[in-house]
Amino acid sequence: MAAEIHSRPQSSRPVLLSKIEGHQDAVTAALLIPKEDGVITASEDRTIRVWLKRDSGQYWPSIYHTMASPCSAMAYHHDSRRIFVGQDNGAVMEFHVSEDFNKMNFIKTYPAHQNRVSAIIFSLAAEWVISTGHDKCVSWMCTRSGNMLGRHFFSSWASCLQYDLDTQHAFVGDYSGQITLLKLEQNTCSVITTLKGHEGSIACLWWDPIQRLLFSGASDNSVIMWDIGGRKGRTLLLQGHHDRVQSLCYLQLTRQLVSCSADGGIAVWNMDVSREEAPQWLESDSCQKCEQPFFWNIKQMWDTKTLGLRQHHCRKCGQAVCGKCSSKRSSYPVMGFEFQVRVCDSCYDSIKDEDRTSLATFHEGKHNISHMSMDIARGLMVTCGTDRVVKIWDMTPVVGCSLATGFSPH
């Protein structure tokens, strides 16, 4: 069922502790059980499984429950030991797990959506279960009565969700690349604002209520940090992945962001440094360096008897430039560009060698990652994906210490 991996610890990379196999289809969610050597998984194979580590070091299923429909999302509340499972048919089901994690009792079904559930969050304080789905809506339901309290529709599939417990604000990412901030009330809601910055569908969100920062990952392979608390519209772009960003986790104590992408890439971003906002791209009818016309500028092409050029943009200054004036490439990590991007010649000359020092570390998960979650207190991470494999990682060599105690393993 599960193999215990004895990797030689290396100070610079995540250590693979265990690999769990046995699912018959893609694993859509995997969550570590706090203070236990256990993992809860939900899969397209219609099963919910609770895996506990045995004396042999291997993980074996102590609970194996088959659902009526493929499982598409999951939330777990440890203090009350409640599991909420979203399904492909739109229903959300609630279960209660026994104290020894050997038995799971069905509580109720919530008719939350008309189509696949994409994300679930449970608020114990409000007694709400909030969910998003491919029926283009966010719904919130009362866990006491099981009744629908409200729903709000979007123009495209709602793909991910975060919720601020104190203010009852929900953040919903969708397939159009937009993030909507909603204030949820008992039977209604109001749209506060929409955030636009990604060029692809939003795949994941992470909300840090302490610094009031929202992080989003998308199919444009990028992460954006939205400084909600600063109230100045400040955003930071982070580009280092080569595939769709699928999962995020912000470590507030160490100011590090962990992100995972579909190709198995694991990135750890240092957010405890002074970063710069990437500039808005400027528009011009001619190169802002050599003044040669771009190909749609027919009048200047005719007047100067020159061929029109393609428009490009310098990632550092945002100016519209031709290919000749932006022939060089450079990384610029302080602006979030961890790999080489197009810069104009004058910006290239202004970038010093120390400016190219990476502000992130990149690692290989060696499987397709569709979902990741962390037990931040223990520095553990679990990843899962379409290869049906669940991997448990020790992230303390990468993030520096055991986050709860400040104890360094080295």
Curated annotation (Swiss-Prot):
The keyword Zinc-finger applies. Pfam families: FYVE, WD40. GO terms for molecular function: 1-phosphatidylinositol binding; zinc ion binding. Zn(2+) 1 binds at residues 287, 290, 322, 325. SMART domains: FYVE, WD40. CDD domains: FYVE_WDFY1. The modification Phosphoserine is found at residue 408. A zinc finger (FYVE-type) spans 281-352. GO terms for cellular component: cell junction; cytosol; early endosome; Golgi apparatus; nucleolus. GO terms for biological process: positive regulation of toll-like receptor 3 signaling pathway; positive regulation of toll-like receptor 4 signaling pathway. InterPro entries: G-protein_beta_WD-40_rep, WD40/YVTN_repeat-like_dom_sf, WD40_repeat_CS, WD40_repeat_dom_sf, WD40_rpt, WDFY1/WDFY2, WDFY1_FYVE, Znf_FYVE. Zn(2+) 2 binds at residues 314, 317, 344, 347. PROSITE patterns: WD_REPEATS_1, WD_REPEATS_2, WD_REPEATS_REGION, ZF_FYVE. Keywords: Endosome, Metal-binding, Phosphoprotein, Repeat, WD repeat, Zinc, Zinc-finger. The FYVE-type zinc finger domain mediates interactions with phosphatidylinositol 3-phosphate in membranes of early endosomes and penetrates bilayers. The FYVE domain insertion into PtdIns(3)P-enriched membranes is substantially increased in acidic conditions. The FYVE domain is required for its function in regulating TLR3 signaling. Positively regulates TLR3- and TLR4-mediated signaling pathways by bridging the interaction between TLR3 or TLR4 and TICAM1. Promotes TLR3/4 ligand-induced activation of transcription factors IRF3 and NF-kappa-B, as well as the production of IFN-beta and inflammatory cytokines. Binds PtdIns3P in vitro with high specificity over other phosphoinositides. Interacts (via WD repeat 2) with tyrosine-phosphorylated TLR3 (via TIR domain) in response to poly(I:C). Interacts with TLR4 in response to LPS. Interacts with TICAM1 in response to poly(I:C). This is WD repeat and FYVE domain-containing protein 1. It comes from Mus musculus. The gene is Wdfy1.
